[in-house]
Amino acid sequence: MTLQAPHTLKFVYRFDEGNASMADLLGGKGSNLCEMARLGLPVAPGFVISTQVCRDYLTKNQTLPEGLGESIRDNIRLLEESIGRNFGSTPSPLLLSVRSGARVSMPGMMDTILNLGINDEIVEGLASMMGDPRPAYDAYRRFIQIYSEVVLDVDPEPFETVLAAHKEKAGVTLDHQLTAEQLQDVVADFKQITKDATGSEPTYDPWEQLMAAVEAVFRSWNTPRAIFYRDHNKIDHDMGTAVTIMAMIFGNLGPSSGTGVLFTRNPSTGKAQVYGEYLTNAQGEDVVAGVRTPEPIASLKDVMPEIYGELMELAENLETHYADMQDIEFTIENSRLFLLQTRNAKRTALSAVRTAVDMVSEGLISQSQALLRVDAEEISRLLVPQFSDAISQDVLDDRFLARGAPASPGAATGTVCFDATKAARLAEAGVDVILVRPETKPDDIHGITAAVGVVTSRGGVTSHAAVVTRGLGKPCIVGCEAIQVDLEAGLFTAGEKTVKEGEQISMDGATGSVYAGELETVSPSLEDLPEANELLRWADQTRKLGVMANTDTPSDAAQALVMGAEGIGLCRTEHMFLDPKRLPSVRQMLLNAETAETWRRESNDRVFRAENEPDSSQAVKDFYEALDQVRKLQTDDFNGILRVMGARPVIIRLLDAPLHEFLPPYETLLVELMELRHIGAPLAELEEKETFLHLVDSLRESNPMLGHRGCRLGLSFPAIYRMQVEAIITAGAQLVKEGLDVNPEIMIPLTVDVEEMHRLREDLSLVASEVQERQGVKVHYMFGTMIETPRAALTAGEIAKESEFFSFGTNDLTQMVFGFSRDDADGKFLRWYIDEGVLPNDPFASIDPQGVGQLIKIAVDAGRRERPNLEIGICGEHGGDPASVAFCHEAGLDYVSCSPFRVPVARLAAAQAALSGS
């Protein structure tokens, strides 16, 4: 069935009609082949069916547009003329490869069909043309298998089983060791497998094969693995794939033929040396699929020195032309080199950073280009774990299992799992999994993504497993041939050692070593990565946004400085309360707060002085005793953090969390009370427990996150906020006396009205003045608020009258704007919303520009109109998300704040936002 299409739509582009700038229309593979052809490089002739045809096909009931078949036939005729072979003809037959290729590289996620155009008659003509029936029948059996799998949806397992049986019968281990006669038997068995599965053998009509293959490639855009990959990598689902149709180049014609993949630099380390591998007497899928372990590319120099020299020259020229590391696929047919593809290479974070920095020094790109070239998220992957130096060599020797090729760096420890689906399920349950396979396939993508590392017994450093894990930043070891995987028994052997599924192993993707059991891992320091520091130095010179960190302890503050933070954007004081040694005092303070506040109001006294209040209740005395203990602890806390940060700003949020977070659960206390009654505990103990239970019950709320917390606590129980401000200013004064410059900024949380800010600021300013007078020094401080409710955003102009800075608490603001509970939504419906396209992104991961973002812009504009020098930033988890950082730059914020380990990400993302907006 065909569909009428506008005559203006051009379906097909010859290689001489395109160039590298046409990736949206011709896909990355097609546009780069056009570019290489334009440069006069040795590319097999072919043409590209555009991505627009794919989009039309998928949106119009999987119907090819009218006229496409005719366009394909016209271009096949041109192909025949250029190569001197005939498609669908026995003499000098032309076979085709039909390959997918979207604008964004998706290695192995879509389908490819090779050796198309063959049948029982044409295989004889191919054998005659090749002068050898073995490669002809090898091509035929490959075609039947891949066509059956991709076009007819036949299970691949029976083909692999039959092929293995034929090799065993012949007494050989490799596919190319089978003779022509043996391959004819394989062909017959493969036909029968297809017939058993579908009711008929694959079509013998080359034109039917071709059109069915084109449709199959289009359909592969929406396979589960392709959708999963796009979801994981945030790739647009609507771009579609092009289809590249090329004359087949045969790498399986004998020892003077072969195929391989090379990178112009090391994709794991970024070292400026050609890196890759090849197979003689093979086709390209053998290398990528990892079914054979290839030879390193350097050894090609000894086998085919002229081809090696030509290949090195082409690799250098392509990298210079594209000004980026290239991933090049090539095939050698009877000592003649052909390039099948070039693309910007997938690489590890370390390689991405090193390549970008080195290319600046080599004059290939500018600093700005280098900053835009490295994905900001990649920076966090630089700090991949490594084995601890404390592990002795004796332990490593004792635990050693096997060594393979290091394909992607990083150390990991996990539970052995042999199945991708099971690995994903275990990972979802919180289990660290290492996926161990003979080789991985594109359908394993969900398991690879879920695993902490991947080990394969076959394949090379350019195989599917290696390419995908490098892109994911996960450790990977390939070609670990000492490991024999028995999938049926659920175990693998390495020499005399056996490891069963469910047992622990450790792996080092940098050395290729696999060890039994669990080994300690540590994360490296950013200080040890000179190229990363150079790139981030350029980022700091470029960005307009400040980058601060969310930290609560002096050690975290020191780590934040190492990561490049310019201050602390959020210090959560309630986290200091949760230390088990402090909880008794904190609980004593909170449980008696209401009684103490009632007494204070009745006595009309701002400050409690025990020696002057002999008639106050024990509860009041307990409250102020606990308050004093907590004040001393908080003073020490703030002293430590302010000391580490020096003159940098430190934004300290006053107590925000609901009180129940510091108290035992009501249900737990109730059970404890029942147990005391059951054992006949003393009356005094029972009364104490009952009093505690009553107090906890009085503080319980139906919806505590929208209840008695934040500034509402500060207004209800002013002594708590006064204590905290006294501790902050006292700590600052202590350091000022030592000659240090400090800049605490006091943040009042959860305001909804300017009157809250007015009352609290007036009261707390008095406390700050009293402390400074008592200490005899001045401390530079500011008061500001956290904008985390819609009303605060909408009335920001009024609130700015009492605030010297705003900090958007985007976690709570997102919850309130959407009406979603962050703790519950993901597991209940949010993931489904995103998968089904109800929402484009997780609003808790990236700022929602239409809702939350609009409120932020309203607040920024209103706040700055009232107070032009108002300091504005965000301190939610969004502060380390590159998309959110870009939004903050556009919205005119002064800074973002995030966890210390996300600071480098934010620094680079802020520079990229500045460059993209300039």
Regions found by a protein language model. Give the residues of each.
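Nucleotide/phosphate-binding sheet-loop regions of phosphoryl- and nucleotidyl-transfer enzymes
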Residues: 2-396, 421, 431-434, 441-443, ...
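Flexible inter-domain linker/hinge segments
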Residues: 214, 383-389, 393-414, 533-552, ...
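Extended, non-globular alpha-helical segments
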Residues: 403-443, 494-534
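A short, small-residue-rich loop immediately preceding and capping a beta-strand
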Residues: 452-458, 476, 873
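Residues forming the flavin
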Residues: 472-474
